[in-house]
């Protein structure tokens, strides 16, 4: 039996805690968390509340030295320096999106990582989603003709993200296009092919706030794509649909559905709400992290795919 790979974590905020808990509770056969670093005062308290959590080390370098794979959930400006330090030390890296705050830096990093044959991937969980696997099976029986993506929020940031509102609510690094639409662009790239932005419109509030609405037309592998996003247009905390040919769709992250003969949407038999699906998805992601770290084939988002998504996101926001 293959031994679990050791995992170091930089950043123990919302995403870091979520992945750490998944590693401890659902993926012990794949990874063993061994070290954490986060300079925030609240991080030690957060870590102390997690049963079986590894110790907090004094520096990022100490975490890199202790692990086989470094998971990076720090603020985006730190992603590339941390990733390059880990790669230089012979570690694999698993990075939260986006790759960087600067597209120029992201492009240069991807070029260096590819040239070096680095073991590096980005955390787009749809790579391991059972609902997406169901969509893929249904899509195999279709000829893709059109895709419609819609996302909507009652407020931005979402309720559970308010602790990070200081930057998520701002135009410079935040907004729902970077945080949420990026996942559906990754899904589109995987399902249909290379992305091309044709036109986009963005609505910004006065001041430095993040976008309140977007519309865009794209193509994906030659298939026409429409994209809409808005704040204040739903009562759900988070509502989204990814609909292919008006016939199959992913709804609210985790419900694979297809159109019935009577015109109603029917869920896949094993459909689950996102909060119940998430542990399964993260377990799958961590199994893929272990495979990547061992140098095996994996399904994780490559740094090239993540860069392609970031290019489209930033082009939309600059429209």
Located regions from the model:
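Beta-loop-alpha module in the N-terminal Rossmann-like domain of NAD(P)-dependent dehydrogenases
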Residues: 19, 51-110
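A contiguous active-site-proximal alpha/beta segment in oxidoreductase catalytic domains
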Residues: 101-161
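Hydrophobic residues in well-ordered beta-strands that form the structural core
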Residues: 72, 95, 120-122, 250
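NAD(P)-dinucleotide binding in Rossmann-like oxidoreductases
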Residues: 206-208, 220-285
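C-terminal helix-rich "cap/oligomerization" subdomain common to oxidoreductases
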Residues: 1-4, 62, 69-71, 288-319
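Rossmann-like dinucleotide-binding domain that binds NAD(P)(H)
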Residues: 162-226, 230-235, 304
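N-terminal Rossmann-like dinucleotide-binding module
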Residues: 1-51
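Short, Asp-centered acidic motifs that coordinate Mg2+ and/or phosphate
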Residues: 35, 69, 146
């Amino acid at each position: 039996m293959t031994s679990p790979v050791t995992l170091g974590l930089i950043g123990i905020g919302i995403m870091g805690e979520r992945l750490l808990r998944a590693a401890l509770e659902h993926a012990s056969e794949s990874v063993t968390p061994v070290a954490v670093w986060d300079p925030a005062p609240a991080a030690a308290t957060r870590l102390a509340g997690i049963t079986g959590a590894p110790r907090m080390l004094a520096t990022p370098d100490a975490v890199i030295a202790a692990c086989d794979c470094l998971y990076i959930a720090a603020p985006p400006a730190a992603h590339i320096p941390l990733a390059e330090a880990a790669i230089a030390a012979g570690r694999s890296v698993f990075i939260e999106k986006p790759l960087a705050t600067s597209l120029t830096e992201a492009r240069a990093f991807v070029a260096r990582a590819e040239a070096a044959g680095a073991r590096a991937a980005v955390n787009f969980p749809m790579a391991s989603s059972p609902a997406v696997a169901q969509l893929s099976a249904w899509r195999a029986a279709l000829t893709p003709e059109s895709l419609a993506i819609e996302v909507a929020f009652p407020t931005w940031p979402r309720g559970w993200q308010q602790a990070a509102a200081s930057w998520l609510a701002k135009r410079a690094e935040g907004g729902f296009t970077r945080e949420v639409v990026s996942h559906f662009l990754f899904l589109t790239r995987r399902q249909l092919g290379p992305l091309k932005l044709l036109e986009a419109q963005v609505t910004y509030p006065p001041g430095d706030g993040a976008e309140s609405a977007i519309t865009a037309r794209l193509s994906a592998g030659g298939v026409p794509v429409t994209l809409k996003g808005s704040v204040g247009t739903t009562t759900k905390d988070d509502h989204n649909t990814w609909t292919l040919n008006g016939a199959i769709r992913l709804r609210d992250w985790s419900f694979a559905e297809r159109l019935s003969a009577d015109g109603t949407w029917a869920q896949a038999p094993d459909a689950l709400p996102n909060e119940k699906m998430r542990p399964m998805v993260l377990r799958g992601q961590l199994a893929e992290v272990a495979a990547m770290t061992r140098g095996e084939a994996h399904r994780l988002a490559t740094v090239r795919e993540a860069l392609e998504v970031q290019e489209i996101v930033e082009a939309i926001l600059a429209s």
